[in-house]
């Protein structure tokens, strides 16, 4: 029972992080196209259109309560980057995306709006080069 509660808390915290990232992107002028887009076992947290309208941005959101163990962005390892690239490739083909493509990471450190820090790493990686 305890493990189920811990997972529920973890999922709720992750959703809070994604909601926070969406709010942040809106304030920066991005248009959100998709949230939690899935294809098979692959998922993209946020798919957005850049403020200038020329770039389709695939965003991985990582949230941590503290940086005692590691920074949130450290959780985006090579496997995660590759999987995000595979999912993005499917999305681009499925929806005939013509814009330029970019892969970003939004790192949220903290557990409330009052104590959080947001770091937006634009063009954080290129899955083709992995």
Predicted regions and their residues:
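Acidic-basic catalytic patches of nuclease active cores, encompassing PD-(D/E)XK
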Residues: 1-36, 114
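Conserved catalytic cores of phosphodiester-cleaving nucleases, focusing on short active-site segments
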Residues: 25, 44-48, 53-67, 84
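Short beta-strand or tight-loop elements
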Residues: 28-29, 40-44, 101
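Short polar/acidic secondary-structure junctions
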Residues: 37-38, 49-53, 97, 110-113
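Structural motif
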Residues: 41, 56-58, 100, 118
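Mg2+/Mn2+-dependent nuclease catalytic core
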Residues: 65-86
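Metal-dependent nuclease catalytic cores in nucleic-acid-processing enzymes
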Residues: 85-95
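Domain-level recognition of nuclease-like catalytic cores that cleave nucleotide substrates
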Residues: 94-130
